[in-house]
Curated annotation (Swiss-Prot):
SUPFAM superfamilies (UniProt xref): P-loop containing nucleoside triphosphate hydrolases
Keyword line: Plasmid
InterPro entries in the cross-refs: P-loop_NTPase
Name this polypeptide is given: Uncharacterized protein aq_aa27
Organism: Aquifex aeolicus (strain VF5)
Origin superkingdom: Bacteria
Length: 259
């Protein structure tokens, strides 16, 4: 009978299909299939956790790395700290200049840079070159403003001849913004754009004053100051009661303005 069964392919297929159907529909087969699915899911989860563990190693930062990051942050901040004068002592980046050794070569490069920059002004006029140099000198003088005005008082001089602030006024493309950028680089400070200056107590002039005293920054370089800032009752003129030199870059006219 078995031999007949093996010879008869049709009967063989019917029997096999019958038992195949029985097997795949049986609870045991279903459980086995579910087990395989669960096993695959577990394997996939294990693989995922393995990848996450490897990723976690990359994300985790050691205490040493954190200290390094904080140190870099402090150094970045120090680079933006400006020159300050307190009780007759000059500070740069929180250190007395007595503690700072400036290489002679660096001084030479700075002087050459200033000379070359002023020489570029010869394309306009001799007056333009003179005023450019005067603006640069004023920026250095402003760092010692307190000491200079105190000395002027001792010598019975008019302190209004040593202005607290200066105005660079000129025609478009006269080089005002470029000059401010150059001075900012010389002093290790940043130029402030007036349009982005936020108001303090409803006045940008108050913000200017806060930057001057709280940030201990001298000079404060502000670009694109509108005329109304000087006329308004809350403006710069009412905050800094002194005489400001008005530099007209690109023009031969130079005058003094009471603020």
């Amino acid at each position: 009978m078995i031999k007949e069964f093996e010879k008869n392919e049709k009967v063989k297929n019917v029997v096999l299909n019958y038992y195949y159907t029985k097997v795949i529909n049986s609870p045991i087969f279903n459980e086995a299939q579910k087990s395989l699915v669960r096993k695959k899911a577990v394997e996939e989860s294990a693989e995922m956790f393995q990848k996450l563990a490897e990723k976690k190693k990359e994300i985790l930062i050691s205490p040493q790395k954190i200290q390094e990051i904080l140190k870099n942050k402090r150094e970045d901040k120090d680079e933006k700290v400006n020159v300050a004068v307190c009780d007759g002592e000059i500070f740069y980046n929180g250190k007395s200049v007595v503690e700072i050794s400036i290489p002679e070569e660096s001084v030479k490069k700075t002087v050459i840079a200033i000379k070359d920059y002023i020489e570029l002004s010869t394309e306009t006029s001799e007056e333009h070159r003179f005023l450019t140099g005067e603006a640069i000198i004023f920026s250095f003088y402003s760092v010692f403003l307190k000491e200079v005005r105190e000395k002027a008082t001792e010598l019975m001089k008019d302190i209004n001849k040593f202005p607290v602030f200066s105005l660079l006024i000129g025609t478009p493309k006269a080089g005002k913004t470029t000059l401010l950028n150059f001075i900012a680089k010389l002093l290790g400070t940043e130029k402030i754009y007036y349009g982005k200056l936020k108001e303090t107590r409803n006045s940008k002039a108050n913000t200017f004053e806060a930057i001057l005293y709280i940030d201990n920054r001298m000079p404060v370089l502000i670009d694109e100051v509108p005329p109304e800032h000087l006329r308004d009752k809350r403006a710069l003129g009412s905050k800094l009661k002194a005489k400001g030199i008005e530099w007209r870059l690109g023009s031969k006219k130079r005058s003094y303005v009471n603020q």
